[in-house]
Amino acid sequence: MSSLDEVAESRKQRLAELRKIKQLENKTRDSQEVQKNVIEHRNYDPEVQAPKMGFVEPPNMIESVEALSKEIEEKTKRKIEEQSSVPVEELDLVTLRPKKPTWDLERDLKERMRSLETQNQNAIAFYIQQLISERAHSTEKA
């Protein structure tokens, strides 16, 4: 019977521990619910009982759009100055020649023409064979 008493005692201890854990969880839930019910005054100052005017905190120095645009403007000015400092004599006019106005059309047509090229060659061969056979028939008749 002593073993049954030990098992019962250990069970009582485990249940007591579970009750304590559950009570702690309930307390934390209650405190969280209280925190949720706190009213945030974003535009209203309860001490003055009037709307907030101006900035409460000083502006921070996070990168703004204006700062970024100034940086981009300075970079482009530097690039333009670097490009203008390159002497004209160094540029080779032969390498700067423009492409044909239809270069992109030719590029697109090359793929289509590949498949048509074999058909074209077959048709030419057929007409040549037909011409040869007609000449052979005409020489036989004559």
Curated annotation (Swiss-Prot):
Claim: Nucleus is one of the keywords in the record: yes
A single BP term in Gene Ontology: mRNA cis splicing, via spliceosome
Tagged with keyword Lipid metabolism: no
Compositional bias ranges of the Basic and acidic residues kind: 24-45
GO cellular component: cytosol; nucleus; post-mRNA release spliceosomal complex; Prp19 complex; spliceosomal complex; U2-type spliceosomal complex
Localization (cell): Nucleus
Matching PANTHER family: COILED-COIL DOMAIN-CONTAINING PROTEIN 12, PRE-MRNA-SPLICING FACTOR CWF18
Quaternary structure annotation from Swiss-Prot or TrEMBL: Belongs to the 40S cdc5-associated complex (or cwf complex), a spliceosome sub-complex reminiscent of a late-stage spliceosome composed of the U2, U5 and U6 snRNAs and at least brr2, cdc5, cwf2/prp3, cwf3/syf1, cwf4/syf3, cwf5/ecm2, spp42/cwf6, cwf7/spf27, cwf8, cwf9, cwf10, cwf11, cwf12, prp45/cwf13, cwf14, cwf15, cwf16, cwf17, cwf18, cwf19, cwf20, cwf21, cwf22, cwf23, cwf24, cwf25, cwf26, cyp7/cwf27, cwf28, cwf29/ist3, lea1, msl1, prp5/cwf1, prp10, prp12/sap130, prp17, prp22, sap61, sap62, sap114, sap145, slu7, smb1, smd1, smd3, smf1, smg1 and syf2.
Protein name stated in the entry: Pre-mRNA-splicing factor cwf18
